Amino acid sequence: GLETPDEGQVIQASNLMIHYLPQNPEFSEEDTVLQSVQNMVHHHANENELIAAKAMLTRLGITDFEQKTRELSGGQRKRLALVSVLITPCDVLILDEPTNHLDSEMADWLENKLQAFRGALVMVTHDRYFLDSVTNKIIELDKGKIYSYDEKYSGFLQRKAEREESVRASERKRQSILRKEIEWISRGAR
């Protein structure tokens, strides 16, 4: 991983392939667009992968494959990194704000790509429409607890509201019992 755990251990299957799209990808400033793709695919890209990469890059508005990465805008860098993680198969795809710097047509293209993806998708995003269209299970980490919802984002919102209302109802019931106990003790135990 990118971070060393404070404690415990990280256990990963030996053949598990994980691809990660950072929010702010970094590249070697002297590499060209195609060299950057080569460097990010975990092996030397074959001809078919390069053809696919060029098609994806073109679809995302990057057509000068010999352009140096230092000349790319932030949005172009994000799109280059996106192509680099999508070009080769993986088991787990971790995406940090994948729709940043994408217009609606590009976001639709990415949506279709991710809907066809058969691995696990872990995503951080503020794009609720996109989240609703590409997810079928949501795992929420809230106050140190993990909650799992076999729902799209819209269903998750409903189920989360129900869970939170149940917690509030339990707390109201607990408070009511405590008030009765305090009243009973105040009157004196008999």
Which residue ranges define each predicted feature?
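Short cytosolic helices in intracellular loops of multi-pass membrane proteins
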Residues: 172-188
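Conserved short loop/turn motifs at secondary-structure junctions
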Residues: 70-71, 188-190
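ABC ATP-binding cassette signature C-motif
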Residues: 1-172
